[in-house]
A protein has these predicted regions:
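Carbohydrate-associated surface elements
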Residues: 119, 137
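Membrane-proximal helix-turn-helix segments that form the acceptor-binding/catalytic region
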Residues: 37-45, 60-61, 65-69, 76-84, ...
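Acidic donor-binding loop of glycosyltransferase active sites
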Residues: 111, 230-248, 263
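Nucleotide-activated donor-binding/catalytic signature segment of Leloir-type glycosyltransferases, i.e.
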Residues: 194, 201-228
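Conserved acidic donor-binding segment of nucleotide-sugar-dependent glycosyltransferases
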Residues: 279-290, 298-304
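Conserved donor-binding/catalytic core segment of Leloir-type glycosyltransferases
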Residues: 149-183, 192
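Short acidic/histidine- and often glycine-rich active-site loop of Leloir-type glycosyltransferases
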Residues: 248-249, 269-280, 284-285
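A short, well-ordered alpha-helix in the C-terminal region of glycosyltransferases
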Residues: 298, 305-320, 326-332
Length: 337
């Protein structure tokens, strides 16, 4: 019970034992149907509950069926693009993307929708007039910088994420190309690539081609341990190569985490970063590779700039993107039903 609203999470992975991460992609249709059946058996006991469907995937069908048969109200919370890039409707009704069709049907039937990005807000707004923008945000109590951070002996630049989409590999390739150019001038800089996913082998081959000993691939780090890692880096980066639906839809959780830890960031001027980062104030925006390199260079050369920009970044997330602020907004939205 928080904020006076009783709630419960039904996670297919944690509650029902479903495979997640890389394991999810190996699941067959029979396994997914069984899990939805188990979830539906739990949900039919909640006759007066509101079902909040968090992102669209195979797990969405159990609460959707609960809505159809039991008339439970539903809320659709979309924080990612889980559909084909450019879906088409043949003859005006037959979809090339079943996920796109199902997502828009769920949106139409929801009492309201939650979007984690402005792009998704516009997408959902085509099917539901009540769409509220709530980004993923960050737990500012967990992601809290140490008061006395020792001076860095080396500059560590960090990219954090998953490798479950080829777009991520493209974005890392962009970052690597920028990094190797910076290394010509700055010999003692290091790049960490942190995460895991089904395209990790592709990432390893990519990094191997660059043949730079100052680039490290690090395993996935648990959320509770992430603040410890982030205390040891100097710069966070959010490179984005292409302006497509997937990249535009992302709510940049790792950007919020960098900012909460008072780390200055350099972000591509694509997608959500453009609404979060004030260029030159609480971070940097870069419109192309040359500008990305230039602004990373500013931060590498100037420790005072890193400190000042990081402090302003922390203020930004405390004001707008902390879980406390966002949960308060969500409570107000729920009370409006």
């Amino acid at each position: 019970m928080k904020y006076g609203i009783e709630s419960e999470v039904c996670s297919f992975a944690d509650t029902l034992g479903a495979r997640d991460g890389e394991g999810e992609s190996a699941m067959g249709i029979a396994e997914k149907i069984k899990l939805n059946y188990l979830a539906f058996k739990r949900l039919i006991k909640e006759k007066n509950s509101i079902f909040c469907i968090q992102r669209f995937n195979y797990h969405s069908f159990a609460p959707y069926l609960g809505h159809l048969f039991l008339r439970n109200k539903i809320i659709f919370d979309l924080d990612d693009w889980e559909m084909r890039e450019n879906p088409k409707y043949y003859f005006g009704f037959y979809p090339s993307s079943k996920a796109h069709f199902c997502a828009r049907e769920i949106a139409k039937r929801s009492v309201f929708c939650i979007s984690a990005s402005r792009f998704l807000q516009h997408f959902l707004g085509r099917f539901n007039r009540k769409v509220h923008y709530l980004p993923s945000g960050v737990d500012t109590q967990l992601f809290n910088p140490a008061e006395n951070i020792p001076a860095a002996e080396k500059i560590v630049i960090s990219w954090i994420g998953t490798f479950n989409k080829m777009e991520y590999i493209e974005n890392i390739d962009f970052a690597l190309r920028c990094f190797v150019k910076l290394r010509k001038k700055h010999k003692d800089i290091h790049l960490d690539i942190v995460g895991d996913g089904i395209y990790k082998d592709s990432l390893v081959r990519l990094v191997t081609r660059f043949n730079d000993s100052n680039v490290r691939i690090k395993d996935w780090i648990a959320p509770d341990e992430m603040p410890i890692y982030l205390r040891g880096i100097q710069i966070g980066i959010l490179p984005v190569r292409r302006s497509n639906s997937f990249n535009l839809s992302k709510s940049p959780t790792k950007l919020f985490e960098y900012m909460a830890m008072q780390k200055p960031t350099v972000c591509s001027a694509i997608g959500e970063a453009m609404d979060i980062v004030k260029d030159g104030d609480n971070g940097y925006l870069a419109c192309d590779a040359d500008m990305f390199i230039k602004k990373m260079g500013y931060l590498i050369d100037n420790s005072s700039l890193r400190k000042q920009m990081g402090a302003r970044a922390r203020e930004s997330v405390e004001d707008k993107y902390s879980l406390g602020v966002l949960c308060g907004q969500f409570k107000e939205i729920l009370e409006s039903i």
